[in-house]
Amino acid sequence: ELFILHTCPFSWKVRGLLEHLDIEYDEVQVNAIRTKKELAFTNGWNKVPVWREKNGEVLVDSTPMMKEIDSRYNDGKLWQSEDEQRRDKWMEWVDEHLKRATIPILYGGLFSALKTTVRVSKLEKFGFFSKRLYAWAGFPIMWGIIARRRVKKDGRKPKQLWHDLLDEWCDEIGEAEFFGGGAPNLVDFAAFGYIRSISPFSQFSQLQEHERGMTWYKRVKATLKA
């Protein structure tokens, strides 16, 4: 079982890997304001994604989870590398820079923050009243407290930030089809997951304007089997 929030970038990281490996699993969408109760079996982790094996064993934290799933169901092939230093460096880069860029692109402006929270309220599992409360009360928090601070600290517009990051990512891939070479590896799927998490929102069009980034993105997407 994979416990998720539909709009959580960390959940999308794991979902892409599972779809690529064609692993059958049940997907459980958690109520966004009841995660502590619904994930009580995690002994205090209380964050998505959570992977639970049939024997009840629980895996948490998206990147270690991806490595463990690859190890158990794919003999660790997607984490194997001839250049482990490069692999580790760029997995850390993806988890640091792409993670921090997701909130600014979705909530970096007042209007975009409102559009995002309304969209989230429709995609996530909320109760009748909590859905409406989140849609209209959530965006000032996400925009005013979190996103504006990150945008101000970075100094770039969210679109420019993403295009700069995609330039850096694609430059590292170079002439290869994927970061992993001729086939995607776990670093590819981690980066793909962060970008894919933006796809349900209108702001994704700003990323689609980056030609090289979208060429790579579509290549990874084409490897998904589920």
Which stretches of residues belong to each language-model region?
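Conserved alpha-helical elements of sugar-nucleotide-dependent glycosyltransferases
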Residues: P9-K13, P200, R212, W216
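GST-like domain detector, emphasizing the conserved glutathione-binding G-site
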Residues: E1-F129
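C-terminal active-site "lid" helix and adjoining low-complexity regulatory extension at the edge
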Residues: G213-A226
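GST-like fold's C-terminal all-alpha helical module
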Residues: E96-R212
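Alpha-helix C-caps/helix-loop-beta hinges
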Residues: V48, D75, E175-A176, F192, ...
